[in-house]
Design a protein with these regions (language model features):
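P-loop NTP-binding module
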Residues: 1-148
Length: 148
């Protein structure tokens, strides 16, 4: 799991890890990515690292391609956490470098037109959208019987 939200990184806090060195440090210094273990078996995190002045510039470099290749040697599946598509160009820039993008939509927060705009931005950047997931959806009490 790679924290590519270089403007507002959060995975280090979520998993109680050291923030640095991380993704940007590996890119800027051409060093091995500092993967950190978590309490979740077989889950390794590469934190965002040092905040760069312009994240989109870093995400667009060939060094990111090289880092992705190095990570592919270490893991079967790599997930990149990126900032919102509509807010900054970072997700579209990164999305063009990976196999596919999963849009994460928040129930009751993400407006339909924002989701549609995000889809348009990614399609314009020739990013493969593999799907979407809805978070924070309320639990329907009628479904509880199914799991009982």
């Amino acid at each position: 799991l790679v924290d590519c939200d270089l403007r507002r990184p959060s995975l280090h806090t979520l998993f109680n890890l050291k923030a640095e060195p991380g993704f940007t440090d590996a890119i800027l210094h051409n060093s091995e990515p500092m993967l950190q273990g978590t309490a979740v078996e077989n889950l390794w995190v590469l934190t965002a690292g040092t905040k760069p002045p312009n994240p989109a510039d870093i995400l667009g470099t060939p060094q990111v391609d090289q880092l992705i290749a190095r990570l592919q040697e270490k893991a079967d599946i790599i997930l990149f956490d990126a900032p919102p598509v509509n807010a900054v160009t970072d997700a579209a820039v990164l999305g063009a470098k990976v196999d596919g993008v999963l849009l994460v939509l928040s129930a009751g927060k993400t407006r339909r037109e924002h989701a549609e705009r995000a889809k348009e931005i990614l399609e314009k950047a020739r990013v493969k959208i593999i799907g979407a997931t809805l978070t924070n959806a309320p639990v329907d009490s009628s479904m509880e019987a199914y799991y009982s």
